[in-house]
Regions:
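ATP-dependent carboxylate activation and anion-phosphoryl transfer catalytic cores
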Residues: 36, 163-239
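Short coil/turn motifs at secondary-structure junctions
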Residues: 47, 120, 136, 206-208
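Structural element of the ATP-grasp superfamily
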Residues: 4, 31-33, 219
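A short, GP-enriched loop/loop-strand-helix hinge that lies immediately N-terminal to
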Residues: 1-23, 38-41
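Active-site nucleotide/adenylate-binding loops and adjacent lid/helix of ATP-dependent enzymes
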Residues: 19-105, 109, 121
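Short small-residue beta-strand/loop micro-motif enriched in glycine and branched aliphatics
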Residues: 13-14, 71-74, 154-157, 210-215
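Phosphate-binding site of ATP-dependent enzymes
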Residues: 83-171, 192-199
Length: 239
């Protein structure tokens, strides 16, 4: 995108600076904290750091995932950890298989949501399109949107009918998008804690434009078909 900007070529989605902010999940969470947007307590680590439970900045249960990457790679039934041995094992596994540092967050046990974003590049107005992502219970009794569930398309995506939650998510998603200096369109993910309070999880300022979460957020909120979505993204990118 930098090359396109330098050469005055129009493009869709955000610039390189914004993409770098959201691609590192810890960096994105720090930006949210500065913007007073709630996100779970966290730290980053890799094998050899935080060598015992006393060195842990936050207490169990925790959620362990790669600090970068998409499609829930590195996330499975063992991502929720309740003790130091399982934490250590998961951190090592991510380093070995994903070649990544880990983002370790306080585990949030509530519902999962994603909010599609359209920003009008002329007026600056932002449209938020919340959806709920429902996942079946795994063998450990948890509802985790893991790699296999995404790969096999086993999750269920539904409209957010609760007006209070819809409005909460819409406001937070818009604030998050602005904090990351997003352009044109994107997607912001949230998860509830056990009390039903939404927490920022991560952002995707260049979401896939196949029939994934962004498309489904357009369909469920705007009754927009796939062709209409593509034309809107393209037209907006040309302004």
């Amino acid at each position: 995108n930098d090359y396109l900007e330098i050469n005055d070529i129009l493009y869709i989605a955000s610039n390189k600076s914004s993409l770098l902010k959201e691609s590192n999940k810890a960096r994105a969470k720090k930006i949210m904290q500065k913007a007073n947007i709630t996100t779970a307590d966290f730290f980053t680590t890799e094998p050899g750091e935080h060598k015992n439970i006393k060195a842990m900045p936050i207490i169990f249960p925790l959620f362990v995932k790669p600090i970068t990457g998409g499609d829930s790679r590195g996330i499975d039934k063992n991502s929720i950890v309740y003790n130091y041995p399982s934490y250590k094992k998961k951190v090592l596994e991510i380093k070995k298989n994903q070649h990544s540092r880990c983002l370790v967050e306080k585990y949030l046990s509530g519902k999962e949501y994603s909010v599609g974003i359209f920003k009008d590049n002329i007026t600056g107005s932002i449209k938020a399109m919340p959806i709920e992502i429902k996942v079946k219970q795994n063998v450990n009794g948890h509802h985790i949107l893991d790699f296999d569930i995404k790969k096999n398309d086993e999750e269920k995506v539904v409209a957010v009918l609760n007006v209070k939650i819809f409005n909460q998510l819409s406001v937070l998603a818009k604030k998050s998008f602005i904090a990351l200096k997003g352009k044109s369109f994107g997607r912001i993910d949230f998860k509830m804690d056990h009390l039903g309070n939404p927490h920022f999880i991560e952002a995707n300022l260049m979401p896939g434009i196949r029939k994934g979460y962004f498309y489904r957020s357009c369909l469920l909120n705007l009754n927009m078909n796939y062709k209409e979505m593509i034309l809107k993204i393209t037209a907006n990118g040309l302004h």
